[in-house]
Amino acid sequence: MKVRGRLLLAFAAATAAPIAAQEPVVAVPDPEALFVSADPALHANKQLALHFMRELLQCNHWERAPEWLSERYLQHNPNGRSGRDGIMAFFTRTRPRTDNCATLTSPVVAVLADGDLVTVVMPREYDHPARAGEKYTSTWFYLWRVVDGKLDEHWAPATIAAP
């Protein structure tokens, strides 16, 4: 009986799915469809996040930032400075401008709005640390607080990159 039990256990272990297996994180086909709500206040907040993602991050139209960002724009990302002027200067200096901003091309998994908070969840691809040449996906998010009709505070799971 002991031998049979060991054989069954060995078979189960050999045929079980790897512990580190995962389902890939996949974006929706039409990300802009997620930035809507039947609730007018939540819809307005989601639209602010859409403008940030599309006009500012994707197309680098930072001259329009005052339409959507508060002057104080608090940054809880260790790689960014607080203040609208600082973020405008950084992105204007470091990224090229794209003229066609008709649709959001960034992959998005979900957009959640609750009260004054809006979260955009995105897939992110990483190099697998144990298997050279392989990639895996996980999630990334942006979270904003809306104050007086503008994005006022921002969080992201960013870490400080090594020099």
Regions found by a protein language model. Give the residues of each.
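Short, low-complexity N-terminal intrinsically disordered segments enriched in polar/charged residues
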Residues: 21-63, 67
